[in-house]
Amino acid sequence: MYSSELEGKPVIGYVKRANKKLKQPKITYNRQLNRLIDNARTVYVTGDWHLWGMGKDGIIRKGKRFYSTIQELRKLRSDDFLIFLGDLVNDEFEDKDALRRILSEINCRTVMILGNNDVMDREFYEQYFDFVVEAFQWKDITFSHFPLPDFTEGFNIHGHIHESTTYWDYCPRNYNAFREDGSFFTLDEILNFFNKGYVNHYGKFIKRES
């Protein structure tokens, strides 16, 4: 059901496209988006699914969190809200039909933040996500794909980096929402851990060094 015509085939003569430069994203403030988050039963935060990608041998394969991500999507209810922090697949994957079958599992309102691997045309993503942005602000939180440094008020929830300890000094008010097992955070979980001084390191919570 979730197979792709590209799986198991070598990518011959493939020239990797340059990633989009989103390290300094345009930060969106959207009242409708913020109201949907305010009124949701549960707000989930996830990113870096990398559902398919090309290995070192040039073969397209499913990512290691492929099936756990689908299981998480099926738990969502219509009155939930999903914040996706970018990188649906690795950027060499171009099978839109296979990706459509995954995205059709989403049954709640959503926002997608474009990651460096999200290089398909924007109109494709807009078919499956209610909002598609480079970054956005909700209350005192900025959501982005790349971590944003130099926050003095509020904080930044981001993807891209799968561990946090390397970036304690660089991003002291940032929280990455990656989980190795593919499960989704709730926004309440993230706020609770951040306020207690913990960072997320591959899904394990470590007390931030002072």
Predicted regions and their residues:
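Conserved beta-sheet core of the metallophosphoesterase superfamily
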Residues: 118, 122-209
